Amino acid sequence: MARGGFPNFGGGGNMNNLMKQAQKFQKQMEDMQSELENKEFSATAGGEAITVVVNGKKQIVSIKIKPEVVDPEDVEMLEDLVLTACNQALKSAEDQTASEMKKLTGGLNIPGMF
């Protein structure tokens, strides 16, 4: 490889600089992952009749259902609302994670990071 090294990795082909940059990047990734895991994301469905909260680990934290939407004659509608709210909350968590990753990597797509 020509002199100058890798862009954004300290230049000059200096292996110590490259290692320092890699360690710094790894620390930033760990910090971001920890921060995202502690965040909560919520979504609603059915005019806020259903509220779902998930965390950054993409685990459902809570589901709130307003009593007035519980209709024993139409359980399927309730199931659809819960499913919709869950999927929206999970998508919100995924979108935020992707956005933070993009900031950290400068838009470089690194498979398997999250």
From Swiss-Prot:
It comes from the Bacteria. The keyword Chaperone does not apply. InterPro entries: YbaB-like_sf (IPR036894), YbaB/EbfC (IPR004401). It is found in: Cytoplasm, Nucleoid. Keywords: Cytoplasm, DNA-binding. Signal peptide: none annotated. One of its GO terms (molecular function) is DNA binding. Gene3D superfamilies: Nucleoid-associated protein YbaB-like domain. GO terms for cellular component: bacterial nucleoid; cytosol. NCBIfam families: DNA_YbaB_EbfC. PANTHER family: NUCLEOID-ASSOCIATED PROTEIN YBAB. Homodimer. Binds to DNA and alters its conformation. May be involved in regulation of gene expression, nucleoid organization and DNA protection. Belongs to the YbaB/EbfC family. This is Nucleoid-associated protein CKL_3826. It comes from Clostridium kluyveri (strain ATCC 8527 / DSM 555 / NBRC 12016 / NCIMB 10680 / K1).
